[in-house]
Amino acid sequence: NQMLKELNTIFKLLLNKDYKNPKLSTKSFFLIISKKFYPVMITYENLKFSGDLKLFDDLNLRNAISETYETFDPIEKLESSEQQTIEAYYEDFLMPKVKFRNMGVSTENYGKDIYFENMVLTRMTTIAQNQEAYNKAIESIKRLKKTFAELQNTN
């Protein structure tokens, strides 16, 4: 993942106390970038709470549908937490401490700030957690597709 790679570069710069390295400033944009999945749960929730999910005769299909949609819940929670972290970083650190006009070209030493270092570690962690949740969802979707294919072959 490109974002993890860039954050890892920042982290290495901080570990080496290479605060004047221009990469520290140029790569810091990756702290506020977020790519969301936005899973759509409405259809599944309507099926589940109305009892209509039981209309699917095949138990394997019902389970595959449920399992797939249930993998989306952790994604939604992780992405929400990640967004709150980004917003707090923006409001509590970037706005009061960084000149946006110079960001990316300046060698300001905000890399020495513990808030900045903590944010790098936090983002590395949240991105890794998101990746894990996405991978689980992808595997579940593959199983659902396989179940659909098996049903088509038997009908």
Q: Which residues fall in each region the model found?
A:
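Long, hydrophobic alpha-helical segments that serve as membrane-spanning/inserting helices
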Residues: N1-N155
